[in-house]
């Protein structure tokens, strides 16, 4: 009496396949770690390289050479393809008009609706220091903080100069410097901020140095304004009077404390 052979995979073959898969994944992760260390990437990039090391790259499917004409409904009345018309008629990003209530809302508007540094800077002005402090009460990611520092460094002097020209040199640049100091202080109250600063990486250090160099210049200008005409200090302290504080935001003590908080040595 003959019995039919059992073609089901044995338990041993399954274990061998799983072991081979685990060995491949372990080798891929080790190679990704070595490659990340050699490239000296920051923590976020290192984590992403390790997590995706075992994944195979997605390749685009091969397009078949089809010489047949497209059907008439693929074209619009102007002769262009409908897909091209749809892509050209996409609405531009919507400018945010409301203060976000969560870090997720902030990040979505920051990335999606603020494409340029000037748009991002105006979004920071919309949120204000108090709004940013509330949004990032739990924590702020190193990537968002790095982008925020780059926007502040690139835009605050330009916005201050434009305001100076519009107001006839009424201390508007000092107001912008005060706003930057208040934003940096508000963000620094986030949870685990010291760890976030460590995760910024060396790429953010030049940005921080340029930003605080400009703030140090604002400190000198603020001191000169206090020693000179009386109307300039009043203009420089106006935003803090609204918030219930009469302390000059561009004081050397506050800027030096911020500089240490963001990991820079005292200048």
Swiss-Prot record:
Pfam families, sorted: Dynein_attach_N, RPAP3_C
Keyword Transmembrane: no
Region (Disordered): 86-111, 226-250
Signal peptide stretch: none
Highest taxon in the source lineage: Eukaryota
Sorted UniProt keywords: Cell projection, Cilium, Cilium biogenesis/degradation, Cytoplasm, Flagellum
Localization per Swiss-Prot or TrEMBL: Cytoplasm; Cell projection, Cilium, Flagellum
Gene Ontology CC entries for this record: axonemal dynein complex; axoneme; motile cilium; outer dynein arm
Family under the similarity heading: Belongs to the DNAAF19/PR46b family.
Function: Dynein-attachment factor required for cilia motility.
Record's subunit section: Homodimer.
Protein name: Dynein axonemal assembly factor 19 homolog
Taxonomic source organism: Chlamydomonas reinhardtii (Chlamydomonas smithii)
């Amino acid at each position: 009496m003959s019995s039919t052979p059992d073609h089901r995979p044995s338990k041993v073959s399954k274990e061998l396949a799983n072991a081979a898969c685990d060995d491949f994944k372990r080798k891929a992760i080790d190679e990704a770690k070595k490659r990340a260390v050699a490239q000296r990437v920051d923590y976020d990039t290192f984590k992403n390289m390790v997590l995706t090391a075992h994944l195979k790259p997605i390749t685009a499917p091969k397009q078949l050479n089809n010489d047949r004409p497209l059907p008439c409904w693929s074209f619009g009345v102007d002769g262009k393809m409908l897909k091209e018309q749809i892509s050209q008629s996409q609405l531009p990003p919507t400018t945010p008009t409301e203060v976000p209530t969560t870090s997720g809302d902030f990040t979505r508007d920051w990335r999606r609706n603020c494409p340029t540094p000037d748009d991002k800077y105006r979004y920071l002005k919309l949120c204000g220091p108090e709004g940013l402090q509330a949004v990032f009460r739990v924590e702020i990611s190193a990537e968002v903080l790095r982008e925020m520092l780059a926007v502040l460094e690139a835009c605050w002097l330009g916005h201050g100069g434009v305001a100076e020209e519009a107001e006839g040199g009424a201390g508007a640049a000092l107001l912008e410097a005060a706003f930057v100091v208040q934003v940096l202080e508000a963000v620094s109250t986030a949870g685990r901020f010291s760890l976030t600063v460590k995760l910024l990486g060396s790429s953010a250090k030049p940005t921080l140095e340029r930003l605080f160099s400009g703030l140090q210049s604002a400190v000198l200008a603020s001191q000169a304004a206090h020693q000179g005409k009386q109307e300039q200090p009043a203009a420089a302290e106006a935003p803090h009077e609204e918030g219930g504080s009469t302390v000059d935001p561009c004081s050397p003590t506050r800027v030096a404390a911020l500089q240490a908080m963001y990991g820079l040595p005292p200048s």
